[in-house]
Every structure is written in C-alpha cells, then in structure tokens.
C-alpha cells in the first residue's frame, strides 16, 4: 500500500509505504532540494531500524525496474542500446539492462553536456568491457537502437518530448522515466506497458501527452498491458514483431520498500552501516 498523497509541511514531503513483509517505510523529501532520506521501520514494534540515502536507493530501484522491463520486453536478439542521459540514474539502468539482455553488444549515449557524455561513455566502456560511444545528438543515439532508454529525468510539470517517432526503429523497446517524454503521435502508435493504467493517468493528474489522449478517448485501460501480467502470465503486448513497446517506468514507489529491505538485510549481514539508538 502506498499513500499517494504525500504529507507536506514546512518544506518537507512524506510518503508512507507498507508491503506484505515485516517492514514498513517512509520517504522524506526536504529542503534544500534533493535532500532525501528513506526510513525503514519494524512492522511489529514500529521502531525505526534504518535510515538510508534515498537518492542511491531510488537509482537502484529504478535501474532494477528498467532491467526487468528490458528482460521481458526487448526484441529478440537486441544488439544496440540507445541512451539519453548520463546522470546519476543512468549507470544502474545500464548495468541492469546489459545483464538482463545478454545479446546487447554496444551502447550509444547522448546528453546535453559533451564532457559528461564522454566521461560516462569511458566509464561504462571500462566497467562493461563493451563499446560505449558518446554521440552528438539524441537522434543519433536513438536511430537503429533495439532498446531506447530515456534516462533524462526532465521536469514533471513540463511537456518536453525527447525524441520524434520516426527515430524509433520498428519493434524497439522504449523505456521512459516520465510520461511527458513522449509525443501523442508516438503513444498512439505503440504498445504501452506499465504497472497499471492508473499509474499513468493518476499521479495525481495525467501528464502530457496522456492528458490529451485521455480527454479525446484515445487512451483507455485496455491500451495498457500490466508489467505484472507480462512477468507472471506471459502476456505479450506485441501483436507482431514490428510493434514498438513503450514501458512507462513511473508508479513503482512501493518497490522502494523492497529494495530498502534488501539493502538493510544485505548491509546487516556484512556488518556495514553505523548503528544508532533513538531510545530515550
């Protein structure tokens, strides 16, 4: 369960998360911007058991989710990954996708700052032991790619498409971190996969271009294949190999709890972290 209406007071935003395990969690967003933490609680005693950096936790969760999407939705024999963005979210997504799709042979990356994309390409080429090329435009990164990862976070309140539909190769998988990165024309001509239809249109309101499509009756629940059905029931969003798939990455907030639980158990088993006591 996730409280999708974060509490806000004095510049602080809180989101509560509870799963089916023995732990519950809370995301805390404060000021200055990007001051973010994750609090993990014992499900029975309600005592806090861990305080974590949410930025790192979030990048691991998003990366793992992108990898799962690539494993189940990438076209057969995918060889090229086209990446837009080289920031802190990019490395976990690239590592996860390369592991999930072992046929990948090369990566093309574009980001707005040449020095950043060059440094990222060098770092990833060394870490992955595969060709990683920094290119000069988004179009160059995307064209010919079997898997496209829109890893530039953008601004959630601004519609800023990162690509044009003709750039996308038929049959490709496009992984998007935010709804507002796509055009209405692209969404109309693709197979959409997400956690659920509601995750796309209710955060708290549908973002462009989905708001326009919903208003026109061109985007309805039957247009979305649930990623859970793909994984557990073998649902295939493609009707033919040339169908392009858009995986909408938002809406996996409850996954933070499970990644935090894994991280807590992993660190505790290795004697890592700094113990603290909040009792009076």
Residue ranges and their predicted role:
Residues 73-80, 103-104, 169-170:
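Short helix-loop-beta connector
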Residues 100-125:
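NAD(P)-binding Rossmann-fold cofactor-contacting core
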Residues 1-59, 65-67, 74-77, 225, ...:
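N-terminal ligand-binding/catalytic initiation module
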Residues 130-213:
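Rossmann-like adenosine-cofactor binding region
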Residues 85-87:
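Glycine-rich Rossmann-fold phosphate-binding loop(s) that bind the pyrophosphate
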Residues 54-58, 176-182, 251-253:
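Glycine-rich phosphate/pyrophosphate-binding beta-alpha loops
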Residues 185-280:
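Adenosine-phosphate binding glycine-rich loop
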Residues 90-91:
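N-terminal Rossmann-fold NAD(P) dinucleotide-binding loop
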């Amino acid at each position: 369960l996730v409280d999708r209406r974060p509490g806000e007071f004095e510049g602080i935003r809180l989101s509560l998360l509870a799963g089916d395990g023995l732990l519950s969690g809370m995301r805390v967003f404060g000021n200055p911007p990007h001051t973010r933490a994750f609090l993990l609680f014992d499900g029975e005693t309600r005592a806090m058991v861990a305080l974590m950096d949410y930025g790192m936790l979030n990048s691991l969760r998003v990366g793992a989710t992108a990898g799962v999407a690539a494993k189940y939705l990438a076209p057969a024999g995918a060889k090229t990954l086209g990446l837009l963005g080289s920031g802190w979210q990019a490395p976990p997504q690239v590592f996860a996708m390369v592991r999930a799709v072992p046929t990948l042979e090369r990566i093309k990356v574009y980001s707005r700052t040449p020095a950043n994309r060059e440094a990222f390409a060098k770092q990833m080429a060394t870490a992955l032991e595969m060709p990683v090329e920094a290119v000069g435009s988004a179009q160059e990164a995307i064209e010919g790619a079997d898997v496209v990862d829109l890893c530039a976070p953008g601004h959630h309140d601004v519609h800023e498409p990162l690509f044009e539909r003709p750039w996308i190769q038929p049959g490709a998988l496009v992984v998007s971190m935010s709804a507002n990165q796509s055009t209405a024309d692209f969404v109309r001509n693709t197979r959409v996969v997400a956690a659920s239809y509601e995750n796309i249109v209710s955060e708290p309101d549908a973002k462009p271009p989905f708001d326009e499509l919903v208003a026109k009756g061109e985007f309805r629940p039957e247009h979305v294949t649930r990623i859970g059905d793909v994984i557990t029931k073998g649902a295939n969003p493609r009707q033919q190999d040339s169908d392009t798939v858009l995986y909408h990455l938002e809406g996996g907030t409850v996954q933070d709890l499970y990644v935090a639980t894994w991280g807590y158990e992993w660190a505790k088993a290795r004697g890592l972290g700094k113990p603290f006591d909040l009792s009076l």
